[in-house]
């Protein structure tokens, strides 16, 4: 019995040793596999995070564009809402005109009885109309004279510079003529002097042979 127990114990010890060896042999591979899986997982997570960030940026840009478009639409709507407000006074204009038209007949009716009571008012109105006609006639009669006087003054003003220009041109012509006359006089005097000198030379030459003959 003891021999059997010893043998069985030895067999169990050997089995435990084999299991330990198997566990030790599998551990490095398992570690390498786990490390590789961790690296792959971290790399995938990094890539996924980048994609998520890019998607968020795109979403933000699209949201910004949409917000800008919405703001532009809101501004256009506000401007459209503002423009009718400016036109509201013009819409009220006809109502005010109607009110004035309604009030004016009442005022005319009030004024008619007062005009019927005094009998001397038509004569005063006739006098006023006659005075106004006379004033208008006088103004119309005086206006042509005023226009004629203004036209004469303007023509005089227009003639004054022309006269000054004519006087200046005449003076220039006189100066030019006087200078030409002076030049002509100088030329005549020079010609006379040259002729007299030639005559003197001729007389002196004629006198020389006479002296020699004498």
UniProtKB/Swiss-Prot annotation:
Task: Please give the InterPro entries that the UniProt record associates with this protein.
Answer: IQ_motif_EF-hand-BS, Neuromodulin, Neuromodulin_C, Neuromodulin_gap-junction_N, Neuromodulin_P_site, Neuromodulin_palmitoyl_site
List the biased-composition ranges (Basic and acidic residues): 9-33, 52-88, 95-122, 150-160, 168-193, 205-214
Where do the segments described as Disordered lie? 1-214
Predominant place of localization: membrane
Task: Write out the entry's keywords from A to Z.
Answer: Calmodulin-binding, Cell membrane, Cell projection, Developmental protein, Differentiation, Growth regulation, Lipoprotein, Membrane, Neurogenesis, Palmitate, Phosphoprotein, Synapse
Q: What does this protein do?
A: This protein is associated with nerve growth. It is a major component of the motile 'growth cones' that form the tips of elongating axons. Plays a role in axonal and dendritic filopodia induction.
Describe the subunit structure: Binds calmodulin with a greater affinity in the absence of Ca(2+) than in its presence.
Name listed for the protein in its UniProt record: Neuromodulin
Organism of origin: Xenopus laevis
Gene it is expressed from: gap43
């Amino acid at each position: 019995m003891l021999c059997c127990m010893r043998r069985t114990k030895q067999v169990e010890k050997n089995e435990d040793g084999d299991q330990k060896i198997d566990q030790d042999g599998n551990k490095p591979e398992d570690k390498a596999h786990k490390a590789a899986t961790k690296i792959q997982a971290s790399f995938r997570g990094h890539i996924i995070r980048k994609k998520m960030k890019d998607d968020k940026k795109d979403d933000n840009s699209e949201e910004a564009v949409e917000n800008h478009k919405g703001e532009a639409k809101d501004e256009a709507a506000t401007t459209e809402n503002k423009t009718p407000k400016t036109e509201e006074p013009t819409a009220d204009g006809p109502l005010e005109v109607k009110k004035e038209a309604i009030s004016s007949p009442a005022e005319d009716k009030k004024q008619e009885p007062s005009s019927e009571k005094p009998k001397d008012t038509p004569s005063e109105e006739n006098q006023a109309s006659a005075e106004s006609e006379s004033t208008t006639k006088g103004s119309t009669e005086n206006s042509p004279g005023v226009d004629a006087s203004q036209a004469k003054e303007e023509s005089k003003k227009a003639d004054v510079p022309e006269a000054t220009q004519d006087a200046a041109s005449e003076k220039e012509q006189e100066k030019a003529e006087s200078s030409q006359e002076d030049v002509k006089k100088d030329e005549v005097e020079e010609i006379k002097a040259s002729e007299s000198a030639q005559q003197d030379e001729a007389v002196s030459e004629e006198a020389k042979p006479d002296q020699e003959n004498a």
